[in-house]
Amino acid sequence: MPIVFWTGKLSLPMKLMINTNNILAWLTGNARDAIAMKQRIRQGYEGVFSDHVTGYDELGTEFQMKAAIAQLEELDLQGKEVLDVGCGTGIISLLALKKGALKVICGDISEYMLKLAREKAANQGYGSDLIEFRNIDAESLPFGDASFDVVITGMTLGLLPDQAKAVEEIARVLRPGGQAAVGAHGPEHYWEACDASFRAINKRYVLGYRLEFWPRTEKEVRLLLEQAGLVDVRTRRLTWQNSFENGGNAYDFFAAISSSWWYAKFPREKIAEDSKKTRNYFERKRITQITDDVILAYGRKPRDLA
């Protein structure tokens, strides 16, 4: 079920504004249209609303690699068949192969992200015998029950309308005894950039549409795994500050990583103008620190009783 009230950190005025807007979205039905929500996210990561996403790897790999390395360091991937849900440009998938995975399925809702992942895999010498690319919906995985030894999703959960369903799908496709590793956006994840963007953008075009980003607490993520039937669940939270030379650089990073999907309802001719205004706001307010808040959760699928 889609979430209505903002679950992360924001300044009080912005939290009140977002919650009021999301109530309106619920009343009009927009907040319950999960298909449209996922479509906006997919289009954002395919560059439909802005070309910022073309800088995804150049501007974001250094920061995203830190979370990916931390997520995989607890996993034994040697000889395992692995599914990477919401693989983006393949950062986790390629790390999994380096850690000895037998084969990785790199799955994402965006064909543009998959294109970049394919190119990176080819450049690193990984063929189709080791890595396969699939367009997938995290809430309805196109795989049979008990298909993988390990299922990983890195920092995708917060973009999904039905997070519980996504975790249930992860558990379903795991083999008995298999490991799940879920990376989730914590409450403070990118909050400075979110807050500044909400203040700066033209509100008339986003009025009545649910925001497509939903951070979670460590306790909430743990509960999602437990409710999906996973056992031996453990979590840890990592936070750090990403520093940028100036506010413009901070905005460029945020717009690329988040894909600027909030421009979905803007007239196309208004997007560049509003993006420039928002970037100027970041510079004027000296937004040069952006928090990474990462919840890492692990669980095991129980073995069949016999």
Predicted regions and their residues:
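Conserved class I S-adenosyl-L-methionine
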Residues: 5-77, 91-95, 125, 181-203
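Conserved Class I S-adenosyl-L-methionine
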Residues: 19, 25-31, 89, 212-306
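Class I SAM-dependent methyltransferase SAM/SAH-binding core
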Residues: 83-85, 89-140
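Residues lining the SAM
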Residues: 107, 154-157, 183
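A short acidic, Gly/Pro-enriched loop at the edge of an enzyme's catalytic core
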Residues: 139-150
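A short SAM/SAH-binding and catalytic strip from SAM-dependent methyltransferases
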Residues: 150-162
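A short glycine-rich, Lys/Arg-flanked "PGG" loop and its adjoining helix->strand segment in the class I
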Residues: 164-176
